């Protein structure tokens, strides 16, 4: 916000202090951040991936107050083996340390698959204030992170 921007060396505010209503105090809110499209074609990204889980449709999230550790769950995922989607997974999740996660991104799909995603219920404060946020991205690949699904792999696959 305008009051704290100078403390972190910024010449101007990022415009992140907002309020839900005229009768609430403004609070510093999450910035709407998007990832610029990369150069990968979606099919080429899948074909170039040997062993992974492609996750779709965000379901829930949790991040600590310092924004250091996080966990996200999705409604659906696809197991990828040898560059092919081989089966659907229910409620997959991923977790990690924020800086390690972002530094592990090695591929981002092109603008053909870029979408502006949003959440209508980012809440904070007392009394609670709820605001919508938006983040745009294309499918991307992140290496070496903990993933899990609601159902374990059958013993024959392990």
Functional labels for PLM-detected ranges:
Residues 1-158:
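N-terminal small-residue-enriched
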